[in-house]
Amino acid sequence: MTTFLFSLAEASGGKEFHIHQPFPVLLQGTYFEINNMIITQWLIVAGLLALAFVINRAVLSGRPSKLRGSLELLIDFLEGWFASFIGSRQYARQYMPLLCTLFLFIIVSNYLGVVPTVGYGLFAPTGRWGTTLGLGIVVAIAVQVIAIRTLGAGGWLKHILHLGPLSLLEEIVHPFSLSLRLFGNIFGEETLLAVIIFLAPMIAPIPIMVLSLVFGALQAVVFTTLTAIYIGAVLEHHQAHAHHPEGEAEHEPAPAH
C-alpha cells in the first residue's frame, strides 16, 4: 500500500507514476510464477517461524524473566478469550496454535502496507483476494478436520448428510465469506487512504498510518474470532451429540408403577 500511496503523491507533483517491484518475478509467464506477493508471504512465514523459535527457547529455558512472565499472562488472556467462543479452556488451549498463527500472519500482512519505504514499499498480501481466499480455505479445511476428529468419520458424514440445503450452503460459503470480508476491508482501506494522501500528501500520512495500524489489528481480531466461532460450533454439536446420541434421552419412556 505504501508504494501506491507515495507513487500517487509523486504523480500529483508532476512526476511519472511508477511502482517498483522489490523482488524479481521468477518463472514469469508460467503457471508456477513466483511473484512479489508470494515472496512477501514467504518472508512473513519465515519471520514468524524465527519469532516462534526465539520465544520457544525463552519459555523452555526455565529461567524466570519478564518475557516469560508476560507470555504467561498473554497466554492466559488468550485462553479465556478463545474459550468464550469455543466453549472451554481445554479446547481453547488445543486450538490456540492455529488461531494465533492466523492472527499473526494477518496482522503482519496488514501492517506491511504501512511500512514507510518510498518507492520500494511492500503491498499488504491481505489486500489481494488470492491470499485471503487461501486463508479462508485453510480455515474451512481445519474446521472439517476438527469435526472428523471429534465426531468420527461416520458421525461427520451423518452430520453432513442431515444438513438442510441452507445449512449445507452455509458450510460451503464460510471460506468465501471470510476471505471476501478480509479482502474487501483491507483493499477498501488501501484505496481510501490512497485517495486521501493524493488529496493531502503533506498532512495526511501520519494520522492515516495510525488509523491503518488500528484497522489492521481489528481485521486480524475479527478473522480469528470468526474462526474460533466456527470451531466452537463444531465442538458444540459434538457435545450435544455425546449427551443425546440419537435423542433417546429426551424420549425415554417413563418407568412403570
Curated annotation (Swiss-Prot):
Q: What InterPro entries would the database entry show? A: ATP_syn_F0_a_bact/chloroplast (IPR045082), ATP_synth_F0_asu (IPR000568), ATP_synth_F0_asu_AS (IPR023011), F0_ATP_A_sf (IPR035908)
Q: Where in the cell is it found?
A: Cell membrane
Q: Where does it sit, as one GO cellular component term?
A: proton-transporting ATP synthase complex
GO-annotated biological processes: proton motive force-driven plasma membrane ATP synthesis
Q: How does it sit in the membrane?
A: Multi-pass membrane protein
Assembly mode: F-type ATPases have 2 components, CF(1) - the catalytic core - and CF(0) - the membrane proton channel. CF(1) has five subunits: alpha(3), beta(3), gamma(1), delta(1), epsilon(1). CF(0) has three main subunits: a(1), b(2) and c(9-12). The alpha and beta chains form an alternating ring which encloses part of the gamma chain. CF(1) is attached to CF(0) by a central stalk formed by the gamma and epsilon chains, while a peripheral stalk is formed by the delta and b chains.
Q: Where are the transmembrane segments?
A: 34-54, 103-123, 133-153, 195-215, 216-236
PROSITE patterns hit by this protein: ATPASE_A
Identify its protein family. Belongs to the ATPase A chain family.
Q: Which key words tag this protein in UniProt?
A: ATP synthesis, Cell membrane, CF(0), Hydrogen ion transport, Ion transport, Membrane, Transmembrane, Transmembrane helix, Transport
Q: What is its main location?
A: membrane
**Any Pfam family matching the protein:** ATP-synt_A
Molecular function GO terms recorded: proton-transporting ATP synthase activity, rotational mechanism
Q: What is this protein called?
A: ATP synthase subunit a
Q: What function is annotated for this protein?
A: Key component of the proton channel; it plays a direct role in the translocation of protons across the membrane.
Q: Which residues form a coiled coil?
A: none
